[in-house]
Amino acid sequence: MNAKRIIVIGGSAAGPKAASRARRMDENAEITIIQKASDLSMASCGYPYYIGGFFDDRDQLLCSPVGVVRDSKFFWNAKKITTKVNTEVTAIDREKKIVEFTNLISGEKGIAEYDKLII
């Protein structure tokens, strides 16, 4: 049987959480997060503390509680979740179960098939 293909659109906070939950539910699934921005799992609720001077390094908003930066490498090594950052979803075809996307830096376009889509 083929592995279930799960695509998560959005990589700020809820997207990576949903992808991580999907991984716990299915260790064999092919999971991909597509994120328009360059940051993954940004704790944006911490911005007031950063602006207020409670810490100096904005990148702390990207870290796990033990200080590990949650970037593409982290999601692959720790959870076997593929990430596409700086990538915008440009179309969703629910009948064909595909998403079309464009890398905002290179301009490269692509298509990904899914069994489950999380937005």
Task: Enumerate the language-model features and the residues they cover.
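Beta1-alpha1 glycine-rich phosphate/pyrophosphate-binding loop at the start
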Residues: 2-84
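FAD-binding core/adjacent interface of flavoenzyme oxidoreductases
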Residues: 1-7, 69, 73-119
